Amino acid sequence: MTTGPNKDAVGAGGALGNAQLVALGAALASDPMSGVALFEPGGNALWANPQLSKMFRGPDASPAQSIGRRLKEIYPEVFANEVVSVIDQCAATGKPALMRTIWRGEQLYTWMQPFRPENANGVQVLAISRKVRGDENARDLFPMVEFEKFDTKVIDLGPLDVLSTRELEVLSLLGQGLSAAEIATALHRSVKTINTHRESIGKKLKIDDRVKLAVIAQRAGLRLADATRQRT
């Protein structure tokens, strides 16, 4: 689905000089809020900053573990295939894309922008990932450009993986601030059943506080549809 107004210049950008690339890379690499990587079509990682490695592979991960390798060598194949397909589409069309996923229990939005650097054989794709809490709309995040928006079919729920599909649905609605009665109506269940699910969620996550459960749901950006997505 294409989002945003039409702009013929999107993705055309022109070639970046080496000095511009160096300055851009230095700025992005040091941004503590952004995970950044550079890919070739096919998903070969040319470069990544430490933040991206930690977002997707944990606090002890480093870029050296990914650079020079294909995504299929690093991540579960079914997830890697999804990401590579977005990279390849960006490179082929010259248009950017926004990819949403849940990874290690947190919602991540990744902006992919194709460009053609000087002295390169072809198009490369710059990927910038950020953690986004709650259900912020991509149209509001990126209102001025035309882009394709994708939700990955495969997610990594992290600590939430212990929950059943129904429990994830209940947790997602808790994160939206719904009461037990409202959740019961939305899921066509009794209030008693919803409270039982909520108690089970609390026991599994070792959290007996409704507000804290809602915060966890918001951190993951949980939506009802996420409950039935394929898990890693």
Task: Describe the residue ranges of each PLM region.
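Basic, Lys/Arg-enriched C-terminal extension of HTH/homeodomain DNA-binding domains
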Residues: 157, 202-232
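Recognition helix of helix-turn-helix DNA-binding domains
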Residues: 177-212, 216
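Regulatory hinge/linker segments at domain boundaries
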Residues: 142-169
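Sensory modules in modular signal-transduction proteins
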Residues: 16-58
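Sensory/regulatory domains in signal-transduction proteins
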Residues: 45-143
